[in-house]
From Swiss-Prot:
Low complexity bias spans: 11-23, 31-42, 189-199, 209-233, 452-467, 497-511, 522-550, 616-632
Annotated protein name in UniProt: Heat shock transcription factor
Keywords annotated in UniProt: Activator, DNA-binding, Nucleus, Stress response, Transcription, Transcription regulation
Gene from which the chain derives: HSF1
Subunit and partners: Homotrimer. Homotrimerization increases the affinity of HSF1 to DNA. Interacts with transcriptional coregulator SSA1 on chromatin.
Compositional bias (Acidic residues): 742-752
Keyword field contains DNA-binding: yes
Compartment(s) of residence: Nucleus
DNA-binding region, residue range(s): 78-168
Homology family: Belongs to the HSF family.
Region of interest: Involved in trimerization: 280-333
Biased composition (Polar residues): 43-59, 238-262, 418-448
Length: 783
């Protein structure tokens, strides 16, 4: 028995027998590939067509054919919706696998490029090209999107997203399951109307189409099917266990399932994913908080570094200003010529000096920089010419016998001379303030007249004792040490430098620097054989009557000034002021010319130096006085002969040098003078370099707490005064001390009450060099 399909679910309008649906709207159904269907099914017209959907009733075995129709296991005819039919055909077409294709398991399909899929493939099967509408239709038929890891919230979405959709009844190679895919409907359904009744009703009426019947059946059983799909996971797929969700955008009515049917399965997976997302967000927040903490620490450290750099810059600026003030003050105080700053730096480097007690005794502290071990194990002094050397004479404690020249060149003779000899130039240093000025007689006797031995003996301490014997004999030191000195040795003349230079003469002397000079002065009870051309009218009777009187007392200074016929105020004029003030220097020269020895030089009639060639060991009064009055290596000096043009500074020598000896040794004097000029230029260059270095880097100050005192006007020159101060150098006290001493010096220069300074800048001024040359020539002429 054959059943007419039009009678069962025919179209609402009558159609011609030859009409066929358009391939665009009604594609061939995939149900034609079912193996249970007959090979040549017949339609109502008795023709066979490949585009006809056929099926056979299980009870009769008679086939039926209709596009989009299928027969279920109960024998009921079901029509597959066109959307599902088109979708199955698109996914199964291998020509469009680049746009849509089945998954490997065949349970889902993929859309790799949604934009390209909607632009190229959707218009072929549908009347639109909107991919969002396609997704909404999939949601209406129960399809859901399978989430992927790359599409999660913890990763940025890629420009091209891979879409995967799945449905429990949409599988590859099983098109018969499409009849179980139903469309969702939110409209209330009639509970009394079932699929069979709707089909029967439509069959009875004869006017309802198959599409309407299927829609009615779907609306009547939508709620039951959804509940059945949820409760039976093996039959409809359990959403909670599969981790799949319904697709919806919230704009299409009916797209959201009822809350009482879908809320339960969707809560558990969403809760799990939200907890993971929350944990990830918490980790991100923790990391961000740690990064913010590190940034704050770095910012604080940066601010601390900038603050420290600023403070360091301020300290450096203050130090530079302090150093500039110190250097400016020192330059203003000492000037740029001579040995000013160089001597001060040398004294500051050593940090120690020589101090003399009030009773005349000297104490010299140990200086490691001035002593060096020689090959024999002995200590040999090395002394450097400078202002500090001119004030540091005095008796030493050396034990050597002869002074040794460090280098055979004349430069070494001018700069550095071995002072291992036991004879040295006495030091003239004030013991207190300017209340006890140093007289010229004492200065001359201590510097140019007599050379004290470093280890005095009691036998040579008398004021009238003599310490020299004949020139062609071997003299024995007054202290009885057995050190024989041959005064006729020509090599001794090489060490004869200017009395103003700081060198060590090589002649013995008595222990008292002023005693030999006092021996040649006429006393009322002295020997009548004593002859002296510049004999004053008994100027030293106080010394003869009271030998215990201090030699550096005001009485002795006045006596010496009276003996030389000099103005006492000139004795208090410093050498530095004489070199810097031409008027003071001229006044001093005029006073020397008017003195007793200056008049003796101008007269040319009185012998200044009787022949000292008397080998009498007892010592004639005349010869011993002359030898003692000279106080240096006087070898072979005959009768004095002068010229009309005699330098008045020769009056400082006692006895006066021989002019013929000076003339005979003019070549040596010129060479020494040229060497001195060369050394002076080198010293000036060195001074400029030191000044620039001091300006840029600062001064090397001592660490022992010694304060440096600069005494120019009181006879102390540039020296050091060591104190018990603390171990930290105070710059403010240092500047105040320098300023105070500078003011005192200026007052003394103005008032003329300062002491005679033993420190001079002879190397920086021509007058000083001239005195050095003359004195040196006098010493060499005697040899």
């Amino acid at each position: 028995m054959t059943t007419n399909l039009y009678a069962i679910a025919g179209p609402s309008k009558p159609t011609t027998p030859t009409s066929t649906p358009s391939p665009r709207s009604e594609p061939p159904s995939p149900l034609k590939s079912l193996t249970s269907l007959p090979t040549n099914p017949l339609n109502s017209h008795g023709t066979s067509t490949p585009n006809t959907l056929t099926n056979q009733l299980s009870s009769t075995g008679i086939g039926i054919s209709k596009p989009g129709l299928s027969v279920d296991e109960n024998g009921e005819v079901m029509k597959v919706p066109a959307f599902l039919n088109k979708l199955y055909t698109m996914v199964s077409d291998p020509e469009v696998d680049d746009l849509i294709y089945w998954g490997e398991s065949g349970d889902s399909f993929f859309v790799p490029n949604a934009e390209l899929f909607g632009r190229e493939l959707l218009p072929r099967w549908f009347k639109h090209s909107n991919f969002s509408s396609f997704v909404r239709q999939l949601n209406m038929y129960g399809f859901h999107k399978v989430p992927h890891l790359q599409s999660g919230a913890l990763k940025n979405e890629t420009p091209i997203e891979l879409w995967e959709f799945a449905n429990p009844y949409f599988k590859r190679g099983q098109p018969q399951l499409l009849t179980k895919v139903t469309r969702k409907n939110n409209r209330p359904s009639n509970s009394g109307v079932g699929p069979s009744s709707s089909v029967g009703g439509s069959g009875a009426g004869g006017g309802m189409s198959t599409r309407s019947a299927s829609a009615a059946a779907a609306s009547g059983s939508a709620s039951g099917q959804i509940q059945q799909a949820i409760s039976q996971g093996h039959e409809a797929g359990n959403h909670s266990t599969s981790g799949k969700y319904l697709i919806t955008d919230g704009t299409t009515p009916g797209s959201v399932p009822p809350s009482h049917t879908s809320a339960g399965p969707l809560i558990a997976p969403q809760t799990l994913d939200l907890s993971a997302i929350n944990s990830g967000i918490a980790a991100i927040r923790q990391t961000q908080a740690s990064i913010a903490t590190d940034l704050r620490k770095l910012q604080a450290s940066n601010e601390a570094l900038w603050r420290q750099a600023y403070e360091t810059q301020e300290k450096q600026r203050k130090h530079e200003e302090t150093i500039d003030l110190i250097v400016s003050f020192l330059e203003r105080l000492f000037g740029t010529e001579g040995e000013g700053l160089k001597g001060l730096k040398e004294a500051m480097r050593r940090g120690v000096g020589v101090r003399r007690d009030r009773d005349g005794r000297e104490g010299r502290d140990s200086r490691d920089s001035r002593f060096a071990e020689d090959d024999d194990g002995g200590q040999k002094k090395r002394r450097r010419v400078g202002i500090d050397r001119m004030i540091e004479g005095g008796t030493g404690d050396g034990t050597g016998e002869h002074g040794e020249i460090e280098s055979p060149t004349s430069d070494d003779r001018l700069v550095e001379i071995g002072s291992n000899s036991e004879y040295s130039i006495p030091s003239v240093k004030r013991t207190s303030s300017s209340s006890h000025p140093i007289s010229l007689g004492q200065l001359g006797s201590s510097r140019f007249t007599a050379l004290p031995s470093e280890d005095p003996s009691p036998s040579a301490s008398g004021p009238g004792s003599t310490s020299y014997e004949g020139l062609h004999t071997t003299q024995t030191n007054a202290r009885g040490a057995g050190a024989d000195v041959n005064v006729t040795d020509p090599t001794l003349g090489m060490n004869h430098l200017s009395p103003l230079s700081d060198t060590d003469p090589l002649l013995p002397s008595s222990s008292n620097a002023l005693a030999p000079y006092s021996s040649h002065l006429p006393f009322p009870s002295s020997n009548s054989n004593q002859s002296n051309s510049f004999n004053p009218s008994n100027p030293s009777s106080a010394w003869a009557s009271n030998p215990s009187q201090p030699l550096l007392s005001p009485t002795s200074a006045a006596a010496a000034a009276h003996a030389y016929n000099l103005d006492p105020s000139l004795l208090q004029t410093t050498i530095g002021s004489l070199l810097q003030s031409p008027a003071a220097a001229q006044m001093f020269l005029n006073s020397l010319s008017a003195s007793a020895q200056g008049q003796a030089l101008a007269s040319h009639s009185h012998p200044h130096n009787p022949s000292p060639l008397n080998p009498n060991p007892n010592g004639n009064a005349s010869t011993s006085a002359s030898a003692s009055a000279h106080g240096m290596n006087t070898g072979g000096m005959g009768t004095g002969s002068g010229t009309k043009d005699v330098d008045p500074t020769l009056a400082l020598f006692s006895p006066l040098p021989s002019h013929s000896s000076l003339t005979s040794q003019s070549n040596d004097l010129l060479k020494s003078y040229s060497d001195a000029l060369t050394v002076g230029e080198g010293v000036d260059n060195l001074q400029e370099s030191i000044d620039s270095l001091v300006r840029s880097m600062g001064l090397d100050l001592p660490n022992g707490g010694s304060s440096v005192g600069v005494d120019v006007g009181d006879g102390a020159g540039v020296g050091t005064e060591t104190g018990e101060g603390d171990g930290e150098f105070n710059v403010d006290e240092f500047l105040q001390g320098l300023a105070k001493e500078g003011e005192e010096e200026g007052e003394r220069e103005v008032e003329g009450d300062g002491g005679v300074s033993s420190s001079g800048a002879g190397a920086g001024a021509e007058n000083g060099r001239k005195e050095d040359v003359i004195a040196q020539s006098g010493l060499k002429s005697e040899s």
